Amino acid sequence: MNKNTLFVLSQYLIPQHALSRLVGWFASTKIDFIKNTFIKKFAAKYDVNMDEAKIEDLEQFACFNDFFTRELKDGARPIADAKLVSPADGAVSQLGKIELGRCFQAKGRDFSVVELLGGDKDRAQPFLNGEFATIYLSPKDYHRVHMPCAGTLKETVYVPGDLFSVNPATAEGVDGLFARNERMVCMFETEHGPMAMVLVGAMIVAGIETVWSGQVCPLPKQAQVQDYTQGEIKLEKGAEMGRFKLGSTVILCFPENAVAFLDEIKAQSPLMMGQAIA
């Protein structure tokens, strides 16, 4: 049995939610010794680039979460003049065609777009033969999430779920990984038609926030749907829409023929927020 197989098996045994809550406490504590130690060790381990952060002094952050969701200096991420830009720093995990309502995850693995978007067939219908992109944010990356194009918020769906780690080993070893983990589904209307933007949680992710609701994950373990069709929450391309308090993944879904990803954007391509992707 190889190392990756053992790692995946361990994911089923670890108390995922309890561990994530414990890490969440450390990430939110304002006790100087704890938060400064935590921040400095993390920044050194992952070689975090603080030169681009508005606050460069590690001890000036009130807690680890503030460091992890740090704001960047003006101009650090220019927004490309393109149909779509990357919503986050990270790397493309997978992208391409949604085949018969399923998105490719890894060799021999895929997941249902209906399940990804909370189990509602009507919500998923526009995307069943569309395009998707899965973008993984590594620990050292900038962890605010921005709009890939201008959009008007129509609906959000909090979907409770597991908290498997998200990495190549679990992508290859856990069936339907992204449709199993806790996630926040955000449905927008855009100039390209409907867009689903899914923020996926993972083990030790202390929370997911949106700019219109604050922290939305974790919530009580039942699905929650919010209707915004009467509201006027409009966000421009490149505007912040949310953030991760520790890790994970953003998935974009578009209808058939709505967008065409650039040829140079492929699996494992590194991305910077604001970079042209379509």
Where are each of the predicted segments found?
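Contiguous, well-folded functional domains in the mature portion of proteins
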Residues: 1-278
